[in-house]
Amino acid sequence: MSKSSFYCFGKSVRGREHRLSGLPNQDALRIYIGKDNNPVIIALADGHGSPVHFRSEVGSKMAVDTAVDILSSVRETDIKVPNKISKYPTLITREWNSRVLLDHKNKKFSSDELGALYDEVKNESFVDYVRLDPKIGYGTTLIVVASYGDSMLYLQIGDGDILVVDDTGNVRKPLRDDVQFSRYQTKSLCTHGASDDFRIAVEKNNGANPVLVLASTDGYSNSFKSYQEFFKVGIAYLDLIRILGCDFLEDILEDLLCKTSSQGSGDDITVGLACSSDLASDHGFIFP
């Protein structure tokens, strides 16, 4: 298959805890479909949402926009050149920094924002540090899944998950897990040297592998008792699409994620799905 084609969709829902506290959804999602479905890009981000990162809702939106704006101009042949691939984290980080600093220049941190930060940390020196390095206020993760012809690009900084499902139902992660100090600390675009914290991989797409790719913020996997249970989502989605089709899953996805958050992590959940066009168009009821 020289030109891969995917049907892409996704949803982002506000978590139970954020609904109760009045905090907006800190996640962001953007899906880009290029000419002739080449490239296809899913970008999602999870703004940290803590009092320290009080503009992370803005930061996450800028992260997905930055990733799509940069990667949508990448040529299919570029994906096969390691030296070019290795530059994407630097390009994305540098552009995200520029955008958040411009946002801060146009809208300086208010006394209310800095006051709330001080109330949380009780440390004037740290407040001064954030004032001098404003990108901290915009902290966010970033996950990208992109298809360029017969190549798949996976790129990530921070927590969250990418699951790849082949036509036999085998589920795996194309990237190593983020090394974190704890469940509540993760790598971020806002930290110094962020470009070095990206994990990145390019894999061949042969049509049968993958047939489905799921990208999600950590609010999804944290809603399950174990990663083994979370991996079953990939198989369940594949089976559901084969029986009822992508349109059905797309229609119920928002309600499904809201229920998962309410019964699980309580966090915002964002999911992006890339389903091979052959799988998306080949479904029907299956009877024993």
Give the residues covered by each predicted segment.
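Short acidic-glycine loop/turn motifs at beta-strand connectors
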Residues: I33-D36, S147-D150, G158, V165-N170, ...
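Catalytic core of PPM/PP2C metal-dependent serine/threonine phosphatase domains
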Residues: I79-L163, F198-G207
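Short hydrophobic beta-strand that contains or immediately precedes a catalytic carboxylate
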Residues: I42-D46, L155-I157, L214-S216
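Short helix/loop capping segments that flank catalytic or ligand/cofactor-binding pockets
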Residues: V52-H53, L153, V164-D166, S223-K225, ...
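N-terminal entry segment of metal-dependent catalytic domains or homologous docking segments
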Residues: M1-S72, G160, L189-E203, Q263-G272
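Helix-loop-helix
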Residues: D65-K108, K232-D255
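C-terminal catalytic subdomain
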Residues: Y184-P288
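PP2C/PPM family metal-dependent serine/threonine protein phosphatase catalytic domain
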Residues: F9-L23, L114-K135, G139, V164-A208, ...
